[in-house]
Regions:
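A short helix-loop-beta submotif of the ANL/AMP-binding
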Residues: 1-13, 17-21, 29-35, 151-152, ...
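Conserved pre-ATP/AMP-binding loop-to-beta segment of ANL
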Residues: 83-85, 91-114, 121, 146-152
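Adenylate-forming
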Residues: 359-361, 394-423, 452-474, 495, ...
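Conserved ATP-binding/catalytic segment of the ANL
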Residues: 340-347, 352-407
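Conserved C-terminal "lid"/linker of ANL adenylate-forming enzymes
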Residues: 430-432, 481-521
Length: 521
């Protein structure tokens, strides 16, 4: 759909369904959109926004999943002039009424991507065609030599996500093959009577966000721990041995891959050569685990405002202590942040990450105030992330300005870093770490992983028929707190970063039932 729009020099705008009805209404009104394309399951979400947004004349939906006729009827009732059709009907219409391409210019706006704003109102990040091309070039200069026409990329992240947008276009540039999956059907455990998306498609490249990789890791550990003592000892012994071999450069890891880790690799299709984490920080332990048990996991860093450019790891320069090289299409500098003691003159150099280059947005759509606050007159975008450079010139993120909270003892803690560590605990399905200036330590609000919670309840002789009942049990709450505190200590957190309390929620977090989101969700 986006390529069809580009062929006619049309600008697209993307918005997450998690922005809610108000966010959707804002993006439609601000862009004065004439058409909207969505999943059929979201047709009902359009009803209230379209009562006020009268510029929309076309509602298009894809053919993946069933739609409810009542939603279509309601939309027609709201606006009788609406044209509503599915993707196949649209394609058939195009085949019968072909038009010549109208290629865009590099300075034309390709996409307006809406992200959560600091005031609650979504911000539209305006990205030109030259920004997208420069981003693909930046990715290619680092990992292009490892990827070619024979590679397969499994795509399943929202297409409103800048990481997905860039990598899909990059895959086409490399001549690779894309397979579209769904986060809910990735693994065999998520489906019945068929293979999961990963094993069916057998990708060679898999890009994911921290929450996906934590789920993969926990799934592997769960299966290993469910095996016999011999299986458990063999797995953990092999993992330790491979770590030693890899760190010393000694041969022999291939034998362990063929004998011990083969079943795990087969569960991911058996063809994976590169895993990549993006969209947020991942626990070192998880990155190392995936790299040893499956295939090397590289890291990437970027923002919507920089068209996903920031840092990207070269697979042959693997490390779990930094994000990687600076892409060729941007430049980065570290700017002093005195409040927390970060200075470019520190050893190593530290400060707020500022990025400049062709991939960087020239401003937020119809939002001069946010643009002036975020972008300097000479084109530097202020990311709000605190970084440092290592001896190899690789970028490492150590904090985030907005997530730095000064506690009662006067010291700063970084909430995003804490969330990445505590998320690695088997008990955690989702998490938000909270701190305030009149308390000495943070607390955590979590959605527990149901199997792990029930297992912990049984170990502590806590009775409860449902997760709704278990999350309110005080004895179990104490046990969960100990699990999280142990994970924090194992992850290298300092004393002031160890949570002193936990609140459990039985419900999955959605825009409809909560008024906050964790920073790395």
């Amino acid at each position: 759909m986006s390529h069809g729009a580009v062929s006619q020099s049309l600008t697209i705008a993307t918005a997450y369904d998690t922005l809610g009805e108000e966010g959707l209404k804002h993006s439609l009104m601000q862009t004065e959109a004439k058409a909207i394309f969505c999943d059929p399951g979201l047709l009902g979400t359009l009803q209230n926004p379209l009562k006020e947004v009268k510029e929309v004349k076309f509602v298009l939906y894809n053919n993946v999943g069933e739609y409810k006729q009542e939603h279509v009827d309601k939309l027609k009732e709201i606006n009788p002039d609406l044209t509503i059709m599915n993707f196949e009907e649209l394609r058939d219409l195009g085949e019968k009424n072909s038009v010549d391409p109208v290629p865009p210019d590099p300075d034309d706006v390709c996409c307006i991507m809406y992200t959560s704003g600091s005031t609650g109102t979504p911000k539209g990040v305006s990205l030109k065609h030259k920004a997208v091309l420069a981003s693909i070039a930046g990715v290619t200069t680092i990992i292009g030599k490892y990827i070619g026409p024979g590679d397969r990329l499994l795509t399943y992240l929202p297409q409103a996500h800048i990481l997905e947008f860039v990598f899909e276009n990059a895959c086409l540039f490399w001549g690779g093959t894309m397979g579209y999956g769904n986060p809910k059907t990735l693994s065999d455990a998520s489906v019945r009577n068929c293979k999961g998306d990963i094993r069916e498609f057998r990708p060679t490249i898999l890009v994911g966000v921290p929450q996906v990789w934590e789920s993969v890791k926990k799934g592997i550990i769960g299966k290993v721990n469910a095996g016999s003592p011999i299986v458990r000892n063999m797995f953990w012994g092999a993992l330790k041995a491979k770590s030693t071999l890899m760190s010393t450069g000694l041969p022999g890891s291939g034998i362990l891959d063929a004998v011990v880790f083969k079943k795990i690799r087969d569960a991911t299709g058996g063809q994976l050569r590169v895993c990549m984490n993006g969209g947020g920080p991942i626990a070192k332990d998880t990155q190392r685990f995936i790299s040893l048990a499956i295939t090397p996991m590289i890291s990437g860093y970027g923002l919507t405002e920089t068209t996903a450019m920031g840092a990207l790891m070269d697979p042959l320069h693997w490390t779990d202590s930094a994000l990687g090289d600076i892409p060729s299409s941007i430049e980065i500098k570290l700017v002093d942040f005195p409040d927390a003691g970060y200075y470019a003159t520190n050893k190593p150099p530290q400060g707020e990450v500022w990025i400049r280059g062709t991939p960087v947005t020239e401003g937020y759509f119809k939002n001069e105030k946010e643009t002036a606050e975020s972008i300097t007159s000479d084109g530097w975008f202020k990311t709000g992330d605190i970084g440092e450079f290592d001896d190899n010139g690789h970028l490492k993120l150590i904090d985030r300005k907005k997530n730095l909270v000064k506690t009662l003892n006067g010291e700063y803690i970084a909430l995003e870093k804490l969330e990445s560590v505590y998320r690695s605990a088997p008990i955690t399905a989702n998490i938000c770490v909270y701190a305030q200036s009149d308390k000495t330590k943070p607390i955590a609000i979590i959605v527990p992983a149901e199997p792990a919670l029930k297992k912990l309840a049984a170990e502590n002789k806590v009775e409860g028929a449902s997760i709704e009942e278990l999350v309110h049990n005080k004895k179990l709450n104490s046990a969960v707190l100990k699990e999280l505190q142990s994970a924090g200590k194992a992850g290298g957190l300092q004393g002031i970063e160890i949570i002193e309390g936990v609140v459990m929620s039985a419900d999955e977090w959605t825009p409809a039932n909560v008024s906050f989101f964790p920073s790395t969700m």
